[in-house]
Design a protein with these regions (language model features):
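Phosphate-binding loop of NTP-binding sites
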Residues: 1-123, 127-136
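Adenine nucleotide phosphate-binding catalytic loops in nucleotide-utilizing enzymes
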Residues: 96-100, 137-185
Length: 185
């Protein structure tokens, strides 16, 4: 389906936090007057959304996709503009066998990305740091504990690489540290 759209694709994957992150990104797009369409592992399939776009072209459209490891098993040419990795933990090992196989399946999402793409990843996850190294896409790390990355957090704010506050922690309505991590992504 990605072959048939020129609209940017943001693909979100990870063991936890995918749905929340997709919803946050969709709201961010809407606030910038970009129509976002959520699809993938939730709601109407991405392919059906693209078919609708072909029949009724729209401008200022972005696809925000929730991607599971299962969906990556059959993908040949998928190439998002932005790939987001929330975290990786030993899930679905009954299907993938080992953690290495699970990580490799998650990496299928970025194998076709070039240097015009972005990989946003949780730099608190050592497996993700190793997994994304060497990709042509630009790496955009975020962290709940490390500073000096593209996005980090302190007791008061989500900060940019330059240390400038981007958003106050108090302004985030979602409770829990895991949701702060989702916001960073």
């Amino acid at each position: 389906a990605s072959w048939y759209t020129d609209s940017p694709i943001v693909a979100v994957t990870g063991s936890n936090g995918k749905t929340t992150t997709v919803n946050i990104l969709s709201e961010m797009c809407q606030s910038e007057n970009v129509q976002s369409i959520m699809a993938g592992n939730m709601g109407i399939p991405f392919s059906e959304r693209v078919l609708k776009e072909l029949k009724q072209p729209k401008q200022n459209l972005a696809y925000i996709l929730e991607i599971s490891s299962f969906q990556m098993e059959f993908v040949l040419h998928f190439c998002p503009k932005i790939a987001v990795y929330t975290n990786l933990s030993p899930d679905h090992l009954d299907r993938h066998g080992t953690m290495d196989e699970y990580v490799n399946m998650k990496l299928e999402m970025v194998k076709n990305m070039g240097d015009d793409g972005y990989i946003v990843f949780n730099a608190d996850d050592p497996q993700l740091i190793i997994a994304v190294e060497g990709h042509d896409a630009k790496l955009v790390p975020f962290s709940m504990i490390r500073t000096g990355l593209t996005y980090s957090i302190d007791s008061k704010n989500i900060n940019t690489l330059t240390g400038n506050p981007l958003l106050s922690v108090d302004d985030i309505a979602l409770p829990g540290k895991h949701n702060l991590s989702n916001m960073l992504g």
